[in-house]
Amino acid sequence: MTYIISDIHGNYDKFHKLLYKIKFSDADTLYINGDIIDRGPNPIKLLLEVMQSKNMIFILGNHEEMMLESAIDASCYATWYCNGSTPTEKEFYSLSFDKQFTILDFLKKCPIAIPNIVISGKQFYLAHAMHLPYYINETIYRNDVSKKLLWETLWSRQYKRPDYKQLVITYHDLYSIYHNTTFICGHNTTPSCSYGITDSHGGGRISKNMSGHLINTDCGCYKTGVLGCLRLDDMQEFYVQ
């Protein structure tokens, strides 16, 4: 089975609770669509486990990009700090220099967009916040795009705004060659989105637009306490709190 999750934000215990719930095994594949680190208690512990896994595929999020930028340019640190870097820094700087280098090197090599995943006859395009504004049919990495496009792919809030319908139309036209491509993102918590849904207690739920080809999996784990996971084989949803 193939699963996707996003925006775990250092919640190591909740992540393992979810793996237990879906009965995740060596025969399965898990895509993590950005934002493993920051805010929660064990971001580096979680990241190291994902790095060592053979069947977990990590797609870069804006929080990992902030970490990379801060390592290169100290002037970028304030932005990272204001977005919850403290737990990540605490764990990261307790590691050896070699281990720190290994982590940064891993993140530099992570994809930012995977447009061609086919599961049970359905095609999926994965990116943390936004698809690229032009057609792609292969995995894209940080160094493949300009800084502006990198920012848009990892940081865009356009799918949160009321005018997201126009973007959905643009996306649908761009990928009409596939007829049935579904874009899956995170980044914007579903309770904050114009198309988002919640449970009876205000907890986030995996949300989609009316046509179903835009899906957001960021249930706001660090805010609402809900971590959601989508199984792509049959589109079944799983949640832990």
Predicted regions and their residues:
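Catalytic metal-binding/acid-base residues of hydrolase active sites
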Residues: 9, 37, 63-64, 130-132, ...
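Residue-level marker for buried hydrophobic side chains located in beta-strands
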Residues: 4, 30-32, 58-59, 125, ...
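Divalent metal-coordination and catalytic microenvironments
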Residues: 7, 35, 50, 61-62, ...
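His/acidic metal-ligating clusters that form di-metal
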Residues: 99-132, 136-195
